[in-house]
A protein has these predicted regions:
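Active-site-proximal, Lys/Arg-enriched surface segment
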Residues: 30, 63-145, 151-153, 255-256, ...
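Single, function-defining residue in the core of a domain
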Residues: 1-12, 20, 47, 88, ...
Length: 427
């Protein structure tokens, strides 16, 4: 095993007994190396090529192993924050996704709305696990689009805690791991009601409804004034009505997912009382300076933020959607066929954990060095994809496995390099 990858996995040894850690390390390495469907039985063939351990040990490790996923999330969060955000505010993204499953009895699976396939006119439901994921937003050294590295997760169950309660739970857990840090949390408009109930030190950015009922801040009480203090001021026009204003707009330069843009912005401090309670918000209406896009209506609870920061923060939220796609498509997060006990939830969680570890390893070992092969039809490629990072790690692990004695390789270097290249890109 690569020394750097081995050191990364060793960071989690304290969460397991020695036998369980060996299964954990071999399982994650096999997950990286396995081409095609990531079923547990297929991973077992790579993890135990000589059959030294029964395959049921891997099923039992996920289904009923005496270890806690929360301990792994804590160790992962400490690892990621120390590497990418050692100081300053910690940027987080929050969203939920559906892992499709099939089978008559998959623990905690149910029918959920499939946000990817649903439209405004047609709602599509699918069977699977509904997962709430909290990720760390990372700006890679090569620039461009940010990355969203998962550092906590909860399984949303039918009849269980609502998504809002689970969201407050995962955020509170991360706060307990970093008690002296402040956080910038970003989520889509569905999670806007969180703004009024987040702990101190968490600043929230989300989308604002176009027809939101906004109010002025309550007026200051006069000396000797009787009666209850007012909770809100006078009713304001809706954001859509405010956007019709001809004055008050100003032009700003923003950076959205690594690209420079020109925007016209209109801002105002207000109360979205029926959603955020008495927490004041900064409303930001963002307009495309060229008039090609619809207006965006955003808000943040950080009243000191600039419009440019609010727009860039919300635009960067798309990184977590990239994470969901990559985990499903390249890590086969939906593939493990484990149906009972904690198996389905743990397998899904490990796929997100592995995604974060692959990117951390790649940034630490490769940095800005080009590790991918330029293709004739894509000569201008300047930044790595997750598949490039995964292929780089596969190449290192396959080379170590096939040619452990590098001083006297059994194949000619040209043949060995070609073999490793093919294996590393087999998906």
């Amino acid at each position: 095993m690569s020394a750097s990858w081995e050191a990364t996995l060793a960071s989690f040894a304290s969460a397991f007994t020695a036998p369980s850690f060996r299964i954990f390390a071999r399982l994650l390495c096999a997950w990286v190396l396995c081409p095609g469907r990531k079923a547990i039985t297929r991973l077992f063939g790579i993890a135990e090529p000589e059959g030294g351990r029964a395959h049921d040990a891997y099923h039992r490790f996920l289904r009923a192993g005496a270890w806690r996923m929360s301990s792994l999330w804590r160790l992962l969060a400490l690892l990621l924050v120390a590497a990418f955000r050692p100081e300053g505010r910690v940027p987080l993204d929050l969203d939920d996704t559906l892992f499709h499953k099939s089978g008559r009895r998959v623990e905690d699976a149910a029918w959920w709305r499939d946000a990817v396939r649903s439209t405004g006119q047609n709602v599509v439901h699918a069977f699977g696990l509904n997962l709430l994921v909290l990720s760390l937003r990372v700006h890679p050294p090569w620039g461009g689009e940010p990355l969203a590295l998962p550092l906590n997760m909860r399984l949303h169950k039918k009849g269980g805690k609502p998504l809002f309660d689970l969201a407050r739970e995962v955020i509170g857990e991360v706060l307990s791991w970093f008690p002296n840090r402040e956080f910038d949390l970003c989520a889509d408009g569905f999670y806007a009601p969180l703004a009024g109930s987040l702990p101190r030190g968490v600043f929230f950015t989300s989308r604002l409804r176009r027809d939101a009922a906004l109010f002025n801040l309550p007026p200051q009480r006069k000396e000797g004034q009787r009666g209850r203090p007012r909770k809100k001021g006078e009713r304001l026009p809706t954001p859509l009505e405010m956007a019709r204003a001809q004055v008050g707009w100003r032009c700003v330069s923003t950076e959205e997912r690594g690209k420079a843009r020109k925007r016209l912005v209109l801002t105002r401090v207000a109360l979205w009382y029926w959603v955020c309670g008495e927490t004041p918000i900064l409303m930001v209406i963002s307009r495309d300076a060229e008039g090609r896009e619809r207006d965006d209506f955003l808000f943040t609870t950080d009243l000191g933020a600039s419009p440019e920061e609010v727009i860039a923060c919300y635009a960067g939220r798309w990184a977590i959607e990239d994470t969901f796609r990559n985990v499903k498509q390249y890590l086969g997060g939906q593939d493990p066929q484990t149906w009972k006990g904690k198996g389905p939830e743990r397998a899904a969680a490990l796929s997100f954990l592995l995604y974060s570890l692959v990117w951390r390893w790649y940034i630490e070992t490769q940095g800005t060095r080009r590790s991918w092969r330029l293709l004739p039809w894509y000569q201008k490629k300047a930044t790595p994809s997750f598949l490039d990072a995964l292929a780089s790690l596969r190449g290192v692990l396959w080379r170590q496995r096939l040619f452990p004695n590098s001083e006297s390789p059994s194949l000619l270097p040209e043949i060995a390099d070609t073999l490793i290249d093919v294996l590393s890109r087999a998906a």
